[in-house]
C-alpha cells in the first residue's frame, strides 16, 4: 500500500477508500502523535469541522470517536470553511484541528486534513508518524473519566470566525455589489455574512447545500455560472469559492475571469504600496503564469516559486518570513491573518483594494498580462511511471525546443487524484493548445 497522505491530507471515495473504520484509526493515531508532546496537564482538545457533503457526518463521527478514545475532548464546529477550522484551532488554544472535506472534488469523494497546534498544516514527517502509529494502535485506551467527550461548538464558532475576518480587513465596502458563488459548500453561510458585514451588497448563489450538490456545476471549478450571474445582476465583481472555501477566484464586471495569479498581483502591489510586502517578495508555485513573474519584475517585486500545493507555499512563507503567497487556483495565504489559504479573507482584501483605489477589478487586474496557458488533466493508472518514461521525456524535449524562450512546459502528477497534469504556456493560444494536446496524447499512451 502506498502513502496514505497526499498533498492535502487523505482523500478518496467515501466509504470505499475513505471508510469510517479508517477515519476512526486516523483520529486515534493523530491524537497520539499530535498530543504526545503536550506541555500541560490540561486534557487535550481537538477542533473538528466539515463541509456539507453527505459523508461528512459519518466521517466526523468516526474521527471524533477515534480522538475521544485517546482521551481528547472534541469541539465540533459543524459546517465551516477549512481556514475557519485552522483559525479556531489557534483561537481556542486547541492541540490539533481536523477538517473533513474533499475541497473541490465531486460529492462522492471526501477527505481528512489535520492541523497542528496553532492551526498549522502538518509537515510530511508528522504525517508519516501518524501513518506509522496507525499500525501499532493498542487495543485498549483510557477508561472512565479519562475518555474524551464531544462538544457542539457550531454556533459560537461561526461568530468567532466572522469576528476574525472583520478584525483583519477594516476597509468598508459600501457601494460595491458582489455576487458570491458558495459552491453549495462550507462557506454557504460565512461568505455572504462576511461580505455583508463589511458593507457590500451581496447576491449569494449556490448557497443551498443539501449534502449532494456540493461543487455540482458550481463554485470555483465551474466559474461560467458566476460569469453569467455577474453580468445579469450588474455587479461590480463576482467571487467563487470551492467546497471548503480555502480558495477564491474572481470575475470582473464584464464577466472576465480573474484567477489566483492576477489576484496575487493585485494584492502584492497593494501591500507594496502600503509598505506591508516583506522584502518585496511574493511566493507562488511553478504552476503560476509566466505573466505573474514579468509583472512582479516590472514593479520591483521578487517572485519565489515552490512545488505545487499551498502547504509548500506556506512553508516557504514561514521560512522566509514573507507576507503573501498563493496559487493560480486561488489559494491565497496572508500569514499575518491566517495559517492557510482563506477564500473569504482573499475576497475581502480584493474588494478593499477596489474600495481604496476607486478602480474596477478589470483595471486592477490589468497590472498583469496573462500569457496563454493550456492545462490538460490526463487520467492515468500509474502516475509514478510517467515522469521516467522515455517517450514522455522525448516529447517534452521536442516541445521545449519548439517553444524556446517564448513559453514553458510543466508536467506533474496530481497529489489528490489519479491524474497527470500537462501545462503549456506559449505566445499564443493555438500553440499552447497544440503542444499541450501532443504531450497529453503521449502521457495517455504510457
Swiss-Prot record:
Its EC number is 5.4.2.10. It holds the Pfam family PGM_PMM_I. Mg(2+) binds at residues 103, 242, 244, 246. GO terms for cellular component: cytosol. It comes from the Bacteria. The keyword Magnesium applies. Transmembrane segments: none annotated. It is an enzyme of class 5 (isomerase). Signal peptide: none annotated. One of its GO terms (biological process) is UDP-N-acetylglucosamine biosynthetic process. Its cofactor is Mg(2+). GO terms for molecular function: magnesium ion binding; phosphoglucosamine mutase activity; phosphomannomutase activity. It catalyses: alpha-D-glucosamine 1-phosphate = D-glucosamine 6-phosphate. Activated by phosphorylation. The active site is at residue 103. Belongs to the phosphohexose mutase family. Catalyzes the conversion of glucosamine-6-phosphate to glucosamine-1-phosphate. HAMAP family: GlmM_B (MF_01554_B). PANTHER family: PHOSPHOGLUCOMUTASE (ALPHA-D-GLUCOSE-1,6-BISPHOSPHATE-DEPENDENT), PHOSPHOHEXOSE MUTASE. This is Phosphoglucosamine mutase. The lineage of its organism: Bacteria, Bacillati, Actinomycetota, Actinomycetes, Mycobacteriales. The gene is glmM.
Amino acid at each position: 500500500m502506498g502513502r496514505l497522505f497526499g498533498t492535502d491530507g487523505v482523500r478518496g471515495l467515501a466509504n470505499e477508500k475513505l471508510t469510517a473504520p479508517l477515519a476512526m484509526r486516523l483520529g486515534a493515531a493523530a491524537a497520539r502523535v499530535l498530543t504526545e508532546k503536550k506541555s500541560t496537564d490540561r486534557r487535550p482538545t481537538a477542533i473538528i469541522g466539515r463541509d456539507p457533503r453527505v459523508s461528512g457526518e459519518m466521517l466526523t463521527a468516526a474521527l471524533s470517536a477515534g480522538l475521544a478514545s485517546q482521551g481528547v475532548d472534541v469541539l465540533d464546529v459543524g459546517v465551516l470553511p477549512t481556514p475557519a477550522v485552522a483559525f479556531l484551532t489557534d483561537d481556542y488554544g486547541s492541540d490539533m484541528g481536523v477538517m473533513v472535506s474533499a475541497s473541490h472534488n465531486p460529492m462522492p469523494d471526501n477527505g481528512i486534513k489535520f492541523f497542528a497546534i496553532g492551526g498549522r498544516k502538518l509537515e510530511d514527517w508528522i504525517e508519516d508518524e501518524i501513518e506509522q502509529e496507525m499500525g501499532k494502535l493498542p487495543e485498549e485506551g483510557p477508561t472512565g473519566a479519562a475518555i474524551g467527550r464531544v462538544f457542539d461548538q457550531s454556533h459560537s464558532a461561526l461568530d468567532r470566525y466572522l469576528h476574525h475576518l472583520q478584525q483583519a480587513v477594516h476597509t468598508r465596502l459600501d457601494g460595491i455589489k458582489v455576487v458570491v458563488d458558495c459552491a453549495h459548500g462550507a462557506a454557504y453561510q460565512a461568505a455572504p455574512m462576511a461580505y455583508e458585514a463589511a458593507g457590500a451588497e451581496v447576491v449569494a448563489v449556490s448557497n443551498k447545500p443539501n449534502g449532494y450538490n456540493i461543487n455540482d456545476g458550481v463554485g470555483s471549478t465551474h466559474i461560467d455560472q458566476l460569469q453569467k450571474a455577474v453580468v445579469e445582476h450588474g455587479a461590480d465583481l463576482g467571487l467563487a469559492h470551492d467546497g471548503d472555501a480555502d480558495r477564491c477566484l474572481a470575475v470582473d464586471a464584464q464577466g472576465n475571469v480573474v484567477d489566483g495569479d492576477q489576484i496575487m498581483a493585485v494584492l502584492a502591489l497593494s501591500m507594496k504600496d502600503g509598505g506591508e510586502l516583506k522584502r518585496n517578495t511574493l511566493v507562488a508555485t511553478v504552476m503560476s503564469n509566466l505573466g505573474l513573474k514579468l509583472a512582479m519584475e516590472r514593479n520591483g517585486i521578487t517572485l519565489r516559486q515552490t512545488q505545487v500545493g499551498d502547504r509548500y507555499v506556506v512553508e516557504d512563507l514561514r521560512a522566509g518570513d514573507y507576507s503573501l503567497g498563493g496559487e493560480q487556483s486561488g489559494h491565497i495565504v496572508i500569514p499575518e491573518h491566517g495559517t492557510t489559504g482563506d477564500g473569504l479573507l482573499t475576497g475581502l482584501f480584493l474588494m478593499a483594494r477596489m474600495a481604496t483605489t476607486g478602480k474596477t477589478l478589470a483595471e486592477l487586474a490589468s497590472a498583469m498580462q496573462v500569457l496563454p496557458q493550456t492545462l490538460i488533466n490526463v487520467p492515468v493508472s500509474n502516475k509514478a511511471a510517467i515522469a521516467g518514461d522515455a517517450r514522455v521525456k522525448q516529447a517534452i524535449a521536442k516541445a521545449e525546443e519548439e517553444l524556446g524562450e517564448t513559453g514553458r512546459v510543466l508536467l506533474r502528477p496530481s497529489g489528490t487524484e489519479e491524474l497527470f497534469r500537462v501545462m503549456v504556456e506559449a505566445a499564443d493560444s493555438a500553440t499552447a493548445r497544440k503542444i499541450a494536446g501532443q504531450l497529453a496524447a503521449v502521457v495517455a499512451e504510457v
